[in-house]
């Protein structure tokens, strides 16, 4: 940890800008416009894995997007709880084998490709094929909140949860969301938009406190497009306030008050991609049961020491021990 006083400064920090006055109205109306379940296909796959049913799920998203997800359900006569997993920025859904660990505990797992990134989901009328990840944060920001690219990603999350909750195999009272970086952000958004989500695990969540990102000068690959917008389109920042006001509608910290279920967060204090201060802006706005674990020596990197076991315990109610105790 480079600055021992960092935690003290962040413990009450809630972000640079406030939630737009019409924020909840905006999102409630966007959800209300999704009047019914979208068209979807759930196709079983034969992977010769005993005791697990494997499916590919595709559905029609907003703006004619096509959304792809992988689904595992334990083979049982009982309805199963489900964990929704979301991947990092520019990535894709879990490999099939990565999903198996949770089925051992009796959980279904759903892992979704974010449209326009590296998986099979596509963006319909705006960019029908291929990876369009660069520029997704600011896409639509000049036109206004309704045109934001991430608005459609967030609505994909809501519809995915509704589809899965409607399936006969699923216990829709026991749904959880999980992810890291962009995935952590989407796990929180899923809980903020769909009250079916009762538990969330978010590791170093992305997409928070955009004005602070600008002030810090975070030119990491994840936020590069934000800085390129100003450098090459608005070098005197004449549109900064308007752009920030628009991006506020997809800022994760602004969804925090909508989350009702338990939230567990993990942050690394050396994170120079999703700076800790922007993560605290989310956590300090949460009004639900919550826990925040800090890893002082970690940056925006794989957290493989004890973290996966803790996440498993949080999501599955298991009691995996983290330390060897000699008996």
Region spans (language model):
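Gly/Ser-rich "nucleophile elbow"/oxyanion-hole loop immediately N-terminal to the catalytic nucleophile
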Residues: 136-181
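N-terminal cap/lid segment of alpha/beta-hydrolase-fold proteins
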Residues: 33-77
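N-terminal targeting or regulatory segments adjacent to alpha/beta-hydrolase or S9 domains
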Residues: 1-51, 324-327
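Short beta-strand/loop motif that positions the catalytic acidic residue
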Residues: 258-259, 265-267, 271
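Hydrolase active-site cap/lid region
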Residues: 189-237, 294
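Histidine-bearing beta->alpha loop at or near hydrolase active sites
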Residues: 289, 294-310
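Acidic catalytic loop of the alpha/beta-hydrolase fold
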Residues: 269-274, 301
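Cap/lid segment of the alpha/beta-hydrolase catalytic domain
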Residues: 94, 100-103, 107-155
